[in-house]
């Protein structure tokens, strides 16, 4: 038995945690047997102030679940010795002895091809085949065992045209598990029905996708760029959101939601790197206001409508009929494959030759001395590097919501609130990046990958 870091335990087995148990016990250390066939956990009882241990083995669907436990041990050392003995005992048993008897179906495998090679999405092939993305691949391979394919087409879409959208759903699953929520596995709609010590949230994921049959409008001149950002992109985001708002079966009326705040999680994939600008553009669209600086003063404009060619959409998503049933809109321009790669390396996954360096620009308002945005640079490969799944998340709160989402239900995110005069109040975490890119080095070749876009060969 050897000790492992918490991020690795979380990646391998964190999805099986019952959130309520953490109000009774505190996790103290994490362990694994040779080859990680078994995992171990030592906990401290918050009430009795003694220690316990848990052994986890893979069930018939290859998910780590508890197979043995004990409590009321007087010290950490006693719990560790008892856990070591238990892991040695269970390590001698066959895999079948770890099965629970309640499993249905076979283990989920996102990477076993279910379509011809010609149909595989380029981003899926990058994840599945490129050594420099092996940390992300191994991380997703650990996560996939806990995924419930309620609509029956997740794997096919993940491998083909829906790769980006499905990765966005996996990001949300990882982020809200990290925060301390558990997913209701029998809920078909919306995408995630979550409960935990912080309350309940229902989330439907949506994406702005590439236009069908036509190209994205050119935006090379200043005039074209201004029109593209002020109107074309907001219209794309508007249609992604209103598609969910006007769903034939309103999500907020689903039995599984049952009065929980209903949130739409939006990502922009309409063009390569489109999510780079999603936060300011989506903020303007959902609130229906635009801020600018004129002669050193903030000018607030009520937008009214977005118009681009024959395309028109009213601005102010939260002002639309029935939008009062949407508690908030969630964004994260950094919730992409590159984050999966970094989080995988933090957990010790992937080819050990892979090295990553992350640099970018972060918000500075939390710094009373110098509130300006600041540059950062971090070596992801160093043991002291930390990053959370929720980092980079922005929550746009609906001022008209019938069921408001409380900010403390999504801690460590950036929360934005529209004020009656059109100003926007920001509640910021200690570190909130605007954007970043990650340089991935393998065998002397470096690839610099924006969190929000595709790879570019550096050197």
Spans of features found by a protein language model:
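Short, well-ordered loop/turn elements at secondary-structure boundaries
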Residues: 177-179, 187-189, 196-199, 257-260
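Short alpha-helical segments and helix-capping/turn motifs at coil-helix boundaries
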Residues: 176-179, 186-190, 244-252
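Conserved short loop/turn motifs at secondary-structure junctions
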Residues: 158-161, 189-193
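A structural signal for short, well-ordered beta-strand segments and their strand-loop junctions
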Residues: 184-185, 193, 202-203, 263-266
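Charged, structured surface patches that assemble and position nucleic-acid processing machinery
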Residues: 1-158, 170, 207-459
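Conserved catalytic cores of phosphodiester-cleaving nucleases, focusing on short active-site segments
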Residues: 176, 192-194, 201-209
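Acidic-basic catalytic patches of nuclease active cores, encompassing PD-(D/E)XK
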Residues: 149-184
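Internal, well-ordered domain-core segments that constitute the primary functional module
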Residues: 179-181, 191, 200-201, 217, ...
């Amino acid at each position: 038995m050897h000790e492992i870091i918490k991020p690795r335990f979380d990646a391998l087995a964190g999805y099986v945690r019952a959130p309520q148990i953490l109000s009774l016990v505190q996790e103290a250390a994490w362990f694994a047997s040779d080859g990680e066939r078994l995992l171990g956990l030592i906990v401290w009882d918050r009430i009795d102030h003694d220690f316990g241990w848990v052994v986890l083995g893979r069930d018939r669907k290859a998910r780590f679940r508890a197979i043995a436990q004990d409590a009321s041990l007087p010290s950490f050392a006693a719990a560790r010795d008892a856990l070591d003995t238990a892991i040695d005992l269970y390590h001698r048993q066959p895999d079948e002895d770890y099965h629970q008897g309640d499993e249905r179906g076979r283990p989920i495998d996102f990477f076993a091809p279910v379509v011809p090679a010609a149909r595989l999405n380029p981003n899926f092939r990058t994840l599945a085949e490129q050594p420099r993305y092996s940390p992300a691949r191994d991380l997703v391979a650990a996560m996939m065992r806990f995924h419930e394919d309620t609509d029956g087409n997740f794997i096919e879409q993940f491998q083909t045209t829906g790769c980006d959208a499905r990765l966005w759903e996996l990001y949300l699953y990882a982020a809200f598990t990290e925060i301390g929520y558990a997913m209701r596995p029998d809920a078909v709609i919306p995408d995630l029905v979550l409960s935990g010590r912080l309350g309940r949230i229902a989330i439907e994921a949506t994406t702005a996708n590439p236009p069908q049959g036509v190209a994205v409008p050119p935006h090379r001149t200043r005039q074209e760029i201004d029109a593209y950002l002020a109107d074309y992109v907001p219209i794309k985001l508007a249609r992604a959101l209103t598609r969910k708002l006007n769903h034939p079966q309103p999500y907020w009326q689903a039995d599984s939601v049952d009065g929980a705040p209903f949130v739409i999680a939006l990502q922009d994939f309409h063009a390569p790197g489109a999510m780079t600008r999603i936060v300011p553009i989506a903020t303007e669209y959902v609130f229906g206001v635009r801020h600018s600086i004129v002669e050193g003063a903030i000018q607030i404009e009520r937008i009214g409508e977005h118009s681009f060619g024959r395309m028109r959409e009213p601005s102010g998503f939260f002002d639309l009929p029935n939008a009062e049933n949407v508690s908030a809109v969630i964004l994260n321009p950094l919730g992409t494959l590159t984050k999966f790669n970094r989080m995988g390396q933090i957990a010790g996954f992937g080819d050990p030759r892979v090295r990553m360096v992350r640099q970018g620009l972060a918000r500075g308002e939390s710094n009373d001395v110098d509130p300006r945005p600041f540059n950062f640079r971090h070596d992801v490969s160093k043991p002291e590097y930390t990053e959370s799944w929720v980092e980079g998340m922005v929550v746009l709160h609906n001022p008209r919501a019938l069921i408001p989402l409380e900010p403390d239900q999504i801690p460590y995110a950036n929360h934005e609130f529209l004020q009656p005069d059109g100003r926007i109040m920001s509640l910021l975490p200690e570190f909130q990046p605007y954007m970043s890119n990650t340089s991935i080095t393998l065998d002397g070749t470096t690839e610099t990958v924006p969190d929000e876009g595709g790879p570019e060969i550096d050197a």
